[in-house]
Amino acid sequence: MPLPDFHVSEPFTLGIELEMQVVNPPGYDLSQDSSMLIDTVKNQITAGEVKHDITESMLELATDVCRDINQAAGQFSAMQKVVLQAAADHHLEICGGGTHPFQKWQRQEVCDNERYQRTLENFGYLIQQATVFGQHVHVGCASGDDAIYLLHGLSRFVPHFIALSAASPYMQGTDTRFASSRPNIFSAFPDNGPMPWVSNWQQFEALFRCLSYTTMIDSIKDLHWDIRPSPHFGTVEVRVMDTPLTLSHAVNMAGLIQATAHWLLTERPFKHQEKDYLMYKFNRFQACRYGLEGVITDPHTGDRRSLTEATLRLLEKIAPSAHKIGASSAIEALHRQVVSGLNEAQLMRDFVADGGSLIGLVKKHCEIWAGE
């Protein structure tokens, strides 16, 4: 399928996707019932969409195009209410978190969807292992060239986004010692990590043509980069965050990305170059492994800085942009989180350290999601 022209969209508009866990009490393992839930709620959703993801234990909640985080929060809240009622009617529960702490990938059923079945054919067991749960944020752009500039600008802050959203310390019944273990699942995919370097939209079109020769790439959706342009929506999509345990944190993360995009495209503070990516995977690893306690390295100067310090600097830089787009509450909440030193991964570990089981941890996550 050829790459579509870049669809011009209103700059800085938002679209947010949350991949949720469908679990089966009282054992709180992943259920295989997302199709049943989707059929139940499909005529009750008035704004946004509830849809499939890769496997039957995943339920995606997606907003419509939103002008700001308040509109997105309203749509999510309405969807949450409908989904929770449908889940209760079927004796199921819903929760966030980037991984389910003890599910076995071999049990996961790939959805009966042509694209997912084709992906299963291409990637085999890797697709079942990709039963992990992330938050994706789309930001509108006025042109393809703006999208490429924005993608490179946001890529500088991938470690910050990972560290702030880290919520996947447990996997396959084990403490991984990572704050965010979810991104590691994709390391075997040939398109893992950053997009190959291009400097404008014309070069991106040439890149896509080249990748399509592999026969594994039929559309932009088949590319699993950390950040990718979405020409059919006219957006740049950030894909590195774990699904948070609460809607409020998900909305705050979206506000952070929206405000950062506003700052990048209005101030144009960087002249991007390929060398910007020299330390990308090392800095990304630091964020996944240590969260805000990680240390990132500047590829140009060699300077090293903790992610706590770097994130506070980012929040300060984008505060004026956040004010202009109505996202100040998100930046203030994230500032409090960074200063407190707490993140969801550590809260999960604290629960287990205090004697809680992994089954009890999932139960707690369901209570958090339902109780907000």
UniProtKB/Swiss-Prot annotation:
The lineage of its organism: Bacteria, Pseudomonadati, Pseudomonadota, Gammaproteobacteria, Enterobacterales. This is Putative glutamate--cysteine ligase 2. Keywords: ATP-binding, Ligase, Nucleotide-binding. It catalyses: L-cysteine + L-glutamate + ATP = gamma-L-glutamyl-L-cysteine + ADP + phosphate + H(+). GO terms for biological process: modified amino acid biosynthetic process. ATP-dependent carboxylate-amine ligase which exhibits weak glutamate--cysteine ligase activity. It comes from the Bacteria. Its EC number is 6.3.2.2. Belongs to the glutamate--cysteine ligase type 2 family. YbdK subfamily. Pfam families: GCS2 (PF04107). Homodimer. It comes from Escherichia coli O81 (strain ED1a). SUPFAM superfamilies: Glutamine synthetase/guanido kinase. One of its GO terms (molecular function) is ATP binding.
